[in-house]
Structure formats: structure tokens, C-alpha cells
């Protein structure tokens, strides 16, 4: 399989808009939960792992927020309370603010 071609639409990766369309259809929830020893974790949920590269988005968020994090069960977990900054970063990345809770 040629890695330069999108498996969904069959267009070259440079012309593919599958991810842009997927961004408009996502219903994303950003919430903060407490974990062991009172540590806070920001959880970004509602992303479709088949249409959005969660590892790439996680790497972007961790780099911009200067925090640790992981991808678990189709959600992104970031160490610390970053709810407002995550919403701003997601909108700068092309996600609609109306679809982010």
C-alpha cells in the first residue's frame, strides 16, 4: 500500500480533506478529574481515533502545555488542569469551539 495516498478517499495525502471534515463533526469533551493523591488530570474525550491521529494531537498538546500525558482508550490524558488552554489550542488546530464542551 502506498503511504502517500489516503485509505479513505483515495486522494494523495496533500489533497486529502478527510481529517478537516472529521474535525467539524467531532463532539469533544474536555474535563478535569482527580486521580491518586489529589493529582488533577485533563481528559480530552470524544475524538474518533479512526479519523484523527490521537498520537499526533497528544504530542502537539503535550508540547504546547509543557506537561506529560498519554493516549488511553480513545481519549487523551494530560497531567494537570489545562481545561481552558486545551480548548484554545484545539480551536487553533481547526476544531469548532461550538463542538467542544
UniProtKB/Swiss-Prot annotation:
GO terms for biological process: formation of translation preinitiation complex; regulation of translation; translation reinitiation. Keywords: Protein biosynthesis, Translation regulation. One of its GO terms (molecular function) is mRNA binding. The keyword DNA repair does not apply. It holds the Pfam family SUI1. SUPFAM superfamilies: eIF1-like (SSF55159). HAMAP family: SUI1 (MF_00604). Belongs to the SUI1 family. NCBIfam families: PRK00939.1, SUI1_rel. This is Protein translation factor SUI1 homolog.
Amino acid at each position: 500500500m502506498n503511504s502517500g495516498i489516503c485509505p479513505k478517499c483515495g486522494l494523495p495525502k496533500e489533497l486529502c480533506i478527510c481529517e478537516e471534515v472529521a474535525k467539524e463533526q467531532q463532539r469533544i469533551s474536555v474535563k478535569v478529574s482527580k486521580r491518586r493523591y489529589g493529582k488533577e488530570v485533563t481528559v480530552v474525550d470524544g475524538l474518533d481515533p479512526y479519523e484523527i491521529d490521537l498520537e499526533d494531537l497528544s504530542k502537539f498538546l503535550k508540547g504546547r502545555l509543557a506537561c506529560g500525558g498519554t493516549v488511553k482508550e480513545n481519549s487523551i490524558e494530560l497531567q494537570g488542569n489545562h481545561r481552558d488552554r486545551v480548548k484554545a489550542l484545539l480551536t487553533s488546530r481547526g476544531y469548532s469551539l461550538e463542538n467542544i464542551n
